Amino acid sequence: MESRLRYRFSGPRKILRGADIQPGQTVLEVGCGTGFHTVSAAQLIGDQGCLVAMDVLSDYVERVSKKVQAAELKNVRVVRRDAMDTGLDTESIDTVLLFSVIPSPTLPLNRFLPEMHRVLKPEGTLAVTTFPWVLRSIRRSGLFAFISKRNGVSNFRRS
């Protein structure tokens, strides 16, 4: 959901700074939704980077595609895909953005986290905003190690 209030208190750039994405990175945004973070993330990684904005809902994919076109971004690929089967190459992603995506009944962690682990590069980062009990589940999975928390974003390194 996009609103002036959300931008004021939790703007996309502030959240993205917490994820520490860098120019030139390949970033996967899971559950891009309305594209609240998409344009800012693409701008932060620059022309040498690549952002894969993924959502399972075609309405969101269409909406984000229009935002990307309007912003004239060439470094974004918007895809309609289930995040438990991304279709991405193994170890191809520097950072996965999971902003208010989990928990979800359509993304059981025992199936979802292994796919995120598979696509992340060996030193890749999983950047998450969610509830504390979900963060504990990520730690307990053994697939990711907690490294930092900044601007409400918990960052995990691929184990």
Annotate the PLM regions.
Residues 6-23:
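Conserved alpha-helix/loop element of class I SAM-dependent methyltransferases that forms part
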Residues 57:
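Conserved SAM/SAH-binding beta-strand->alpha-helix loop
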Residues 72-83:
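Conserved SAM-binding strand-loop segment of SAM-dependent methyltransferases
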Residues 84-96:
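A short acidic, Gly/Pro-enriched loop at the edge of an enzyme's catalytic core
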Residues 94-108:
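A short SAM/SAH-binding and catalytic strip from SAM-dependent methyltransferases
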Residues 110-122:
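A short glycine-rich, Lys/Arg-flanked "PGG" loop and its adjoining helix->strand segment in the class I
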Residues 123-130:
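Conserved beta-strand signature within the Rossmann-like core of class I S-adenosyl-L-methionine
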